[in-house]
Structure formats: C-alpha cells, structure tokens
C-alpha cells in the first residue's frame, strides 16, 4: 500500500510540474508570435476591467473583512449555527479572525520590502512586461496549485496534520470558522510568499485580481449559505453546475471536506483539497462530487479544545488528557485542568 501511495504521489508531483509550466509556455509562445514586441495595451489592465480596479483595491484592503462580517451576520440571523458557537469555539474563531490581520502583514511586508530586495536586488519588476492575462494565470495556477499541495500534505503527513486540525475542529461551517487556523500553519502558507515574490517581480496588478477572486470563492465555499443549491435543484442549471463544481470549490464539495465522517458517502475529508480551483482534485483523483451536504462537521474526538492550544500548538499544549495537542512545549495555564476525553481515534487521524 505504501509503495502504491508513493508512486501516486510521485506521479501527481510530476503532473503538477507540467501544470506549473503551462502559463510560462503560453507567455513564451505569445512572446514568439509577437516577435518580442509586447503591446502596451496587453500589459495594462484590459479596458473592460479598468472600471473594476478601484473596487478590487477596496475589496483587498477592507472589503473582504466587511464581506465576511456581513455573511456572518446573515448566517447567525438565519440560525445556521444551531447555538454551537459557544465557549472555546467562540474564543478560537475570534482570535483566528483578528490575529492574522494584525500579525501577518508585518511578516509579509518584511519579506516583500526587505528580504526580497536583499536576496534578489536586481530582479525587481523584471516581469513587468508580461501581459495581464499571462500574469493572472501564472499567479492563479502557481498560488492555488501550491496551496493544494500545502493543504493535501497537511492531511496526509501525520505530523503536519496537527498544525491543520484546528481548521477541522469546528462542528459547523460558516464565516465564524473560515479563518480558524493554527497560526504557524498560516504563517508558513507557501503561496503567500510565492505570490509576494511574483508581485515583487512586477506582477502586482494580476496578483490583486487573483487575490480578490480567490478570497471570494474560498469564503463562499466555507459559508453555511449554500449558494450552489439552486444549480443542483433546477435541471436547466445542471450544465452550469457540472462545470462549476469541477472548476472551483463550492459549498457542497468543501463542506464534504469538513465532514466528521466519510462513511455516509458524502463526507470526504481525505480529499477535496482544492482552495480556489477544485479542478486539482479532479486531475489528481482526490475529489468527490455528490451535490449533497454532510449532516455533521468537525472531528470525532476534538471538541472544545483550549483556544491557545488550537491556535499556537506546539508552543502551547492542550491540558486535555489524550489529546494529540498535549505534546507541546508549554503548559498554559500553569494550574492543571485535566479533562477526560473518550479514548478513540479521531476520524481525521486515519490519514
């Protein structure tokens, strides 16, 4: 079994390398067909998108936060959390929502404004000649395919899983848990630094559009407002649904990824890893499309973990006896608080 899995992993990585080269080859072909002359109008934002640039800039700076808050209010108003947002759930969701917005920008700023100019000082804006469409697809593929692998490996490598399990501990879906991640998992998002590097190389405008579009798709996939249901309900929309659910992440496919079981034929936590694009799961055979939603979410033995252990493991460890997060560095608070939990293997540990 291990040999088969290793062979599949090797095959998938090889296919990924080929996919990474596609936008590069397309840009090279364009460059050859134009005899090395890139039209100024091709580098700039297409005229039909020019009007949207201010909107995208506002969405990037504050609009996405407002979008999340508005969706969250609607979700709570509709009673979609079923009174599950209590205790440790509330603490970890709020902290994971606020902390990255305060702590991550300085990290990215240091990488973009200090590290990159020091490491590759002569390469700034060297890709500024790339047409907008080329830069868009280059960043979209490089960013999202990299995140697919980052996500997939955090499910398939037991040690890495402990950094990602925080995101799967929520017994509900929605804006409240969309940002719920271990901070170390977030800081080491490989695609963040990849996109920052491509922006430094001169692809800032395409990066802006990719960021906004990707954020809206991923937030929509986490939302408990199942916007994709009408596409499954009405037969006339089925052709559109067929394309959508294979191209991008939808509530149905991503909710299945957060299910607490795979035994019902709906949940699929061992797949559906795609973030913006679901097509990676289609290509690599890790996807499951049922057009149905799980009855319950989370993990079987991971309820109400302490917020500090979920957010900062292994710096802080859980006080819950038997928890995989109990093997940390620091016990906090200092006064022990032992809580017995059922001795069973979490469903998601079986990876």
Question: Over which residues does each language-model region extend?
Answer:
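Cytoplasmic membrane-interface regions of multi-pass membrane proteins
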Residues: 1, 77-86
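N-terminal membrane topogenic signal
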Residues: 2-21, 56-59
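Alpha-helical transmembrane segments in multi-pass membrane proteins
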Residues: 16, 42-75, 87-105
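Alpha-helical transmembrane segments of multi-pass membrane proteins
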Residues: 19-38, 70-78
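Membrane-helix interface motif
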Residues: 26-44, 109-120
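Membrane-water interface of transmembrane alpha-helices
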Residues: 69-80, 149-159
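Membrane-embedded catalytic scaffold of the fatty acid hydroxylase/desaturase
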Residues: 96-111, 118-293
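A membrane-cytosol interface segment of integral membrane proteins
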Residues: 206, 290-351
């Amino acid at each position: 079994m291990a040999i088969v899995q290793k062979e599949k992993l090797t095959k998938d990585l090889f296919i990924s390398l080929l996919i990474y080269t596609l936008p590069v080859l397309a840009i090279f072909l364009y460059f050859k067909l134009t005899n090395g002359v890139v039209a100024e109008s091709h580098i700039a934002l297409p005229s039909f998108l020019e009007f949207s640039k201010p909107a995208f800039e506002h969405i990037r700076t504050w609009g996405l936060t407002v979008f999340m808050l508005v969706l969250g209010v609607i979700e709570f108003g509709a009673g979609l959390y079923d009174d599950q947002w209590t205790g440790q759930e509330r603490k970890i969701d709020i902290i994971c929502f606020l902390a990255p917005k305060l702590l991550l920008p300085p990290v990215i700023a240091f990488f973009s404004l200090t590290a990159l100019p020091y490491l590759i000082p002569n390469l700034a804006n060297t890709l500024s000649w790339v047409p907008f469409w080329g830069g868009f697809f280059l960043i979209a593929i490089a960013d999202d395919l990299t995140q697919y692998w980052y996500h997939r490996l955090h499910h398939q490598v037991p040690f890495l899983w402990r950094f990602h399990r925080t995101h799967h501990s929520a017994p509900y879906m929605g804006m409240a848990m969309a940002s719920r991640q271990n901070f170390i998992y977030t800081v080491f998002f490989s695609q963040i630094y990849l996109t920052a590097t491509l922006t430094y190389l001169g692809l800032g405008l395409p990066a802006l559009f990719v960021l906004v579009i990707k954020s809206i798709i991923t937030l929509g996939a986490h939302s408990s407002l199942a916007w994709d249901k009408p596409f499954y309900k009405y037969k006339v929309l089925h052709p559109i649904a067929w394309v959508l659910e294979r191209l991008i992440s939808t509530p149905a496919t991503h909710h299945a990824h957060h299910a607490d079981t795979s035994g019902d034929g709906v949940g699929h936590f061992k797949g559906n890893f795609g973030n913006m694009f679901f097509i990676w799961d289609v290509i690599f055979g890790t996807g499951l499309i049922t057009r149905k939603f799980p009855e319950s979410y989370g993990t079987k033995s991971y309820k109400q973990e302490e917020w500090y252990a979920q957010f900062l493991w292994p710096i802080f460890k859980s006080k819950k006896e038997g928890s995989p997060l109990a093997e940390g560095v620091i016990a906090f608070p200092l006064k022990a608080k032992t809580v017995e939990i059922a001795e069973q293997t979490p469903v998601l540990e079986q990876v």
